[in-house]
């Protein structure tokens, strides 16, 4: 697909607002290197790749939601109080 149009993407997404939100989340995943693209990069920017994936029907909200679920360790460990010693 040489050029991506909004109409191509709207075949797979309900409206333009959902398209913007979906493309934003997917482009961020691609830009941070957290996820691999489902189409060839072809020297495009992450935003264009995200739109091409949506237009191809390879990415939808279900895919994005699954990718957002992360089972990492918590950012903060449980606080353990240390005794204060008076000087």
From Swiss-Prot:
The keyword Translocase does not apply. GO terms for cellular component: DNA-directed RNA polymerase complex. Pfam families: RNA_pol_Rpb6. GO terms for biological process: DNA-templated transcription. InterPro entries: DNA-dir_RNA_pol_omega (IPR003716), Pol_omega/Rpo6/RPB6 (IPR006110), RPB6/omega-like_sf (IPR036161). SMART domains: RNA_pol_Rpb6. Its EC number is 2.7.7.6. It catalyses: RNA(n) + a ribonucleoside 5'-triphosphate = RNA(n+1) + diphosphate. GO terms for molecular function: DNA binding; DNA-directed RNA polymerase activity. Keywords: DNA-directed RNA polymerase, Nucleotidyltransferase, Transcription, Transferase. Promotes RNA polymerase assembly. Latches the N- and C-terminal regions of the beta' subunit thereby facilitating its interaction with the beta and alpha subunits. PANTHER family: DNA-DIRECTED RNA POLYMERASE SUBUNIT OMEGA. Belongs to the RNA polymerase subunit omega family. The RNAP catalytic core consists of 2 alpha, 1 beta, 1 beta' and 1 omega subunit. When a sigma factor is associated with the core the holoenzyme is formed, which can initiate transcription. This is DNA-directed RNA polymerase subunit omega.
């Amino acid at each position: 697909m040489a050029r991506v149009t909004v109409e191509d993407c709207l075949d797979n997404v309900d409206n333009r607002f959902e398209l913007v939100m979906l493309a934003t989340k997917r482009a961020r995943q691609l830009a941070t290197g957290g996820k691999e693209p489902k189409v060839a990069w072809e020297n495009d920017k992450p935003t264009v790749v995200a739109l091409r994936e949506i237009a191809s029907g390879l990415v939808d909200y279900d895919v994005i939601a699954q990718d957002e679920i992360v089972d990492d360790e918590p950012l903060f460990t449980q606080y353990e109080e240390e005794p204060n010693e008076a000087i």
